[in-house]
Amino acid sequence: MAKGQSLQDPFLNALRRERVPVSIYLVNGIKLQGQIESFDQFVILLKNTVSQMVYKHAISTVVPSRPVSHHSNNAGGGTSNNYHHGSNAQGSGAQQDSEETE
């Protein structure tokens, strides 16, 4: 399973480290917005006015508000830690939308 996470972990870690606002679309169409506070193999903690634990199996798409560089610098492609935690995440307003109109 580490191979499948070699794309996921660097991407999510870059979003967490750089505190990039993200929109997370769930498989049922609901849109969540916030900043990734931390994540592990099964869940993502999304921070806004409240922290929400979002199970990865319920996620369809993660859309950053801006481009991020997520390439891993280590040749192994993995991380030595299975849990990633943001130190002092900022954010406000956990938002939930059934559908987005732009």
UniProtKB/Swiss-Prot annotation:
GO terms for molecular function: RNA binding. The keyword RNA-binding applies. One of its GO terms (biological process) is regulation of translation, ncRNA-mediated. InterPro entries: Hfq, LSM_dom_sf, Sm. Residues 70-96 have a biased composition (Polar residues). Residues 9-68 form the Sm domain. Keywords: RNA-binding, Stress response. Pfam families: Hfq. One of its GO terms (cellular component) is cytosol. The keyword RNA-binding applies. It comes from the Bacteria. Residues 63-102 are annotated as: Disordered. RNA chaperone that binds small regulatory RNA (sRNAs) and mRNAs to facilitate mRNA translational regulation in response to envelope stress, environmental stress and changes in metabolite concentrations. Also binds with high specificity to tRNAs. HAMAP family: Hfq (MF_00436). Homohexamer. Belongs to the Hfq family. This is RNA-binding protein Hfq. The lineage of its organism: Bacteria, Pseudomonadati, Pseudomonadota, Gammaproteobacteria, Enterobacterales. The gene is hfq.
